[in-house]
From Swiss-Prot:
Protein name: UDP-3-O-acylglucosamine N-acyltransferase
Stored InterPro entries: Hexapep (IPR001451), Hexapep_transf_CS (IPR018357), LpxD (IPR007691), Trimer_LpxA-like_sf (IPR011004), UDP_GlcNAc_AcTrfase_non-rep (IPR020573)
Molecular function terms from GO: N-acyltransferase activity
Gene name per UniProt: lpxD
One Gene Ontology CC term in the entry: membrane
CDD domains according to UniProt: LbH_LpxD
Native source organism of the sequence: Pseudomonas putida (strain W619)
UniProt-annotated catalytic positions: H240 (proton acceptor)
C-alpha cells in the first residue's frame, strides 16, 4: 500500500509550522541517514544532529532551534518524536481488515460477533464470547468461553485467550501471546505438589498493547489486572494476581511474580525480575536486569545491575566481592587497634 500526502496536509494534521513547499509530495518515512526524495524524516535525538545538513529527505520534522539555518523543507514542531509517532499511522502498510467471518472460522452459536468485526481463517470463538465493533482477529486465534474483546481491538494471528478474559477498547495483542493461562499455583503436601485451581480471570483495560509471546496468567481467586494504557513488550511473564497501574511500560523479558502490584506511570526496563507479593509505587523507573526483591515506596530510579566493563576488570571486581566479608572483619580489627593507639590505651569518649 502506497500513501501520498502533501507537506501542507501533514502540517495541518500536526498543527506544525511549514517551512518550504506546501505542495511537496511525501510518500513515506525514513531515518536521517537513509531518507531520500519523497520521504519525511525527523530529528529527535541530538546525537543525530550531525546527519541533518547532508540529509537527502524531502522534509524533516524539527524543533524551532534546529530549523534555524537548515536549508531544506521542514515541519517545525515542539516534539519531533511525538509528531513522528502521530503521522507514522498515516503511512503504515499493515493490511486493513475486512468485516466478516471467514468460512473456516468456528464460532459458537451463542457467541456474539459484531457485524463490523473481522474474523480470520481458522479462528475459534467459544461459547458466550463477545466480540465488539471493528475488532480484527487474525488467523488461528482462539477466543475462550465468555471472553470479551472490546471495540477496535486488534489480535494478530495465533493469539490465545483462555476463558473469562475481558479486554477493553483498542487493545493490540501480538502473535503468540497467551492471556489467561493457569497461574503457577501449588500446595506442598509432604514433598508432593498439589495443584490449586486458578478460578480468577484476566481484566485488561483500554489502549493496552501486549507483545509477541508474552504471557499473562489468570488470577488464583480474583483477576489479574492490567490497567488502561499499559504497554508490554515481547516475551514478558505476568504471573497470577499481578496488578499493573495505568500507563506503565515494560520492555522485553521482564518477569513479574505472583500478587505483585505495580503503580502508574512506571517504566520497567528489559530483563527485570520482581519477586512476588511486593508493591511498587507510581512513577518508578527500574533499569535493565535489575532484581527487585522488596517493595519500592518512593518514586525514582532504581537499579541492582552491574555495569559492563572489560572481562579482565570484571573478574578482578568479582574476586574482590568474594573477599568483602574478610576485608570487613580485618578493617574492624584495624579500627580497634587505631582506637587503642590514639586513646593511649584508655577507653574513648564514645565507649
Amino acid at each position: 500500500m502506497t500513501v501520498t500526502m502533501t507537506l501542507g496536509q501533514l502540517a495541518e494534521a500536526l498543527g506544525a509550522t511549514l517551512k518550504g513547499s506546501e505542495a511537496l509530495q511525501i510518500t513515506g518515512l525514513a531515518t536521517l541517514q537513509e531518507a531520500g526524495p519523497g520521504q519525511l524524516s525527523f530529528l529527535a535525538n541530538k546525537q543525530y544532529r550531525k546527519y541533518l545538513d547532508n540529509c537527502q529527505a524531502a522534509a524533516v520534522l524539527l524543533q524551532a532551534a534546529d530549523a534555524e539555518g537548515f536549508a531544506g523543507n521542514a515541519l517545525i514542531v515542539a516534539d519531533p518524536y511525538l509528531a513522528y509517532a502521530r503521522i507514522s499511522h498515516l503511512f503504515d502498510p499493515k493490511p486493513k481488515a475486512v468485516a466478516g467471518i471467514h468460512p473456516s472460522a468456528v464460532v459458537a452459536e451463542d457467541a456474539q460477533v459484531d457485524a463490523s468485526a473481522s474474523i480470520g481463517p481458522f479462528v475459534v470463538i467459544e461459547s458466550g464470547a463477545r466480540i465488539g465493533a471493528n475488532v480484527s482477529i487474525g488467523a488461528h486465534c482462539v477466543i475462550g468461553a465468555r471472553c470479551v474483546v472490546g471495540e477496535g481491538g486488534w489480535l494478530a494471528p495465533r493469539v490465545t485467550l483462555y476463558h473469562d478474559v475481558t479486554i477493553g477498547k483498542r487493545v493490540v495483542i501480538q502473535s503468540g501471546a497467551v492471556i489467561g493461562g493457569e497461574g503457577f499455583g501449588f500446595a506442598n503436601e509432604k514433598g508432593v505438589w498439589r495443584k490449586i485451581a486458578q478460578i480468577g480471570g484476566v481484566t485488561i483495560g483500554d489502549d493496552v498493547e501486549i507483545g509477541v509471546n508474552t504471557a499473562v496468567d489468570r488470577g488464583a481467586l480474583s483477576d489479574t489486572r492490567i490497567a488502561d494504557g499499559v504497554k508490554l513488550d515481547n516475551q514478558i511473564q505476568i504471573a497470577h494476581n499481578v496488578q499493573i497501574g495505568e500507563h506503565t511500560a515494560m520492555a522485553a523479558c521482564v518477569g513479574i511474580s505472583g500478587s505483585t502490584r505495580i503503580g502508574k506511570h512506571c517504566t520497567i526496563a528489559g530483563g527485570v525480575g520482581m519477586v512476588g507479593h511486593i508493591d511498587v509505587c507510581d512513577n518508578v523507573f527500574v533499569s535493565g536486569m535489575t532484581m527487585v526483591t522488596r517493595s519500592i515506596t518512593e518514586p525514582g530510579a532504581y537499579s541492582s545491575g552491574t555495569a559492563m566493563q572489560p572481562l579482565a576488570d570484571w573478574r578482578k571486581s568479582a574476586a574482590r566481592i568474594r573477599q568483602l566479608d574478610d576485608m570487613s572483619k580485618r578493617l574492624q580489627q584495624l579500627e580497634k587497634r587505631v582506637d587503642t593507639v590514639t586513646s593511649g590505651g584508655q577507653p574513648t569518649s564514645e565507649g
